[in-house]
Design a protein with these regions (language model features):
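Conserved blade-ending motifs and adjacent loop-strand segments that build the rim/top face
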Residues: 349-361, 391-422
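Signature of short aromatic-glycine-proline-rich micro-motifs recurring in repeat-based ectodomains
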Residues: 85-94, 300-312, 359-362, 408-425
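N-terminal secretory signal peptides
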Residues: 1-10
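Blade-level signature of beta-propeller repeat domains, shared across WD40, Kelch, NHL, RCC1
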Residues: 417, 422-452
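C-terminal segment of N-terminal export signals and the immediately downstream linker at the start
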Residues: 9, 29-64
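N-terminal export leaders
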Residues: 10-28
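Loop/turn-rich, solvent-exposed surfaces of beta-rich toroidal or solenoidal domains
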Residues: 324-325, 354-391
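Beta-propeller domains
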Residues: 272-346
């Protein structure tokens, strides 16, 4: 594990500004006794939530604090700029600077088998997933352009932005040709989508074939941290041979707790306790014979640590934050903080029950240094804020009930997950997705009145 890397040092502030992450407020690692522990604290955040009408449709789709407004766009079935239709199952997403008042969003579509929704760029004609890219004007609050940027992939769940202005989209499956599948090619990879165009549609095999969820890139080193969404999962990192050129290859490793080899972190954990970590090699990141736990098993045999369903991941001010969707004694979720400089990890939050936090999934770091947690739980779904002083509060509530008013959708979608939370680089807009029926929202309001 001593192989040298060719590293380009990216400016941390440029990357934080690029993706709308925290710049001015003390991050979680500035906390000491204030980290949420046995006393789980909840506050009003921006105040009580109330139903708010969508600026686009006039429907009461979201509950928000007073003073906030939103608009919807990019519904499943809406036309793309070329006349084809927007695919569904909106999931992970990130916002990027372009020029002037315009930003671009790269958005995942977590679809499985089926005809690819675009002919180019396409990996597998029978892969239903991929990404679309949206150009949005932050002054006018309107969509300028939208196009398919990757097609023919499968189960594109989350991913993450890079400091070199691209989106890494992750396949949450290891399915391939044969059996019950009609895929032409193997799946379970990471693909790179440039913000200024379309993807090459070539998987980055050295980053591993497993049940991927999300990634977070450390701009100081170019190392890519990867989460795995399995009941027993590992936390991986990819050390590229050439920073910003991931396709050139690299090596994959899995986190281990050096004070407890083969540790199981799913339960029995204490908040605010640092654990020293090391990394064990994954010798075969793309095995010929694949099972969902093939790479995890390699890591465990070498002493790696087990987590419960690692999903969302995001970089913020020198730290990597990841969530375990059903970790903890209540199986309602954990939030972990990894310190790459100190090579240590700690639990900073564990949900005591469904009313506090119900199975977090996608996450992002807010402009003021907190975390936004998108729920994918068992009840009415929320987006919740977790602040730097260790408090949690509801910020968005799903109120989507439709009777055919838009694109023919009917049904009660209030228990369906939120995903893709990401702030505009100027911090004025929060973008997020309702996975079903497939809607993207842009939320704005008096951010300075509260902790996000």
């Amino acid at each position: 594990m001593t192989q040298e890397l060719s590293v380009t040092r990216f400016d941390r502030r440029q990357f934080l500004a690029l993706t709308g992450a925290a710049l001015s407020v003390a991050p979680f690692h500035a906390l000491a006794s204030h980290v949420v522990g046995s006393e789980q604290r909840a506050t009003d955040g921006y105040g009580p939530l109330q139903p708010v009408r969508d600026d686009t449709t006039g429907l009461l789709l979201l509950h928000l604090p007073a003073g906030f407004r939103y608009l919807s766009f990019g519904w499943t079935g809406d036309p793309l700029s070329d006349g084809s239709l927007t695919p569904g199952s909106h999931d992970g997403m990130a916002a990027f600077s372009t020029s002037g008042s315009r930003i671009r969003l790269v958005r995942n579509h977590e679809l499985r088998r089926g005809t690819a929704f675009a002919a180019r760029p396409m990996y597998d004609a029978n892969g239903g997933g991929g990404t679309t890219t949206i150009e949005f004007d932050t002054v006018t609050g309107s969509v300028v352009d939208v196009w398919a940027s990757l097609a023919g992939t499968a189960v594109n769940c989350a991913g993450g932005p890079t400091p070199w202005n691209s989106w890494l989209t992750c396949e949450e499956t290891v399915a391939g040709p044969g059996g019950d599948n009609d895929y032409h090619h193997p799946h379970g990879y990471i693909f790179e989508v440039p913000v200024d165009g379309t993807a090459s549609a070539k998987p980055i095999r050295s980053m591993g074939r497993f049940v991927h969820e999300a990634v977070a890139v450390d701009p100081a080193t170019g190392i890519v941290y990867e989460t795995e969404d399995q009941a027993a999962s590992g936390f991986f990192r990819f050390l590229p041979d050439e920073t910003s050129n991931l396709a050139a290859g690299g090596r994959l490793e899995m986190l281990a707790l050096t004070d407890k080899p083969q540790a199981d972190t799913r339960t029995g954990q204490t908040t605010n306790v640092w654990h020293p970590v090391g990394w064990v090699p994954i010798d075969d990141p793309d095995p010929d014979e694949i099972a969902a736990d093939s790479l995890y098993s390699q890591g465990i045999e070498a002493g790696g640590a087990t987590f419960a369903r690692l999903e969302g991941a995001w970089y913020g001010d020198g730290r990597i934050y990841v969530v375990s969707t059903n970790g903890g004694e209540a199986q309602m979720g954990q939030v972990w903080e990894y310190d790459p400089t100190g090579e240590r990890v700690r639990l900073i939050f564990e949900s005591p029950g469904i009313d506090v936090l119900d199975m977090p999934d996608n996450i992002c770091v807010s402009p003021r240094g907190g975390l936004l947690l998108c729920e994918d739980g068992q009840s009415n779904c929320f987006v919740r804020g977790l602040t730097v002083d260790g408090t949690i509060f509801p910020f968005v509530r799903n109120n989507i009930v439709l009777a055919g008013e838009k694109n023919g959708f009917e049904g009660d979608f209030r228990t369906r997950e939120f995903a893709g939370a990401t702030f505009s680089p100027d911090g004025r807009w929060l973008f997020l997705n309702a996975q079903s029926p497939g809607i993207t929202f842009a939320v704005t309001g008096p951010w300075s009145d509260g902790p996000l």
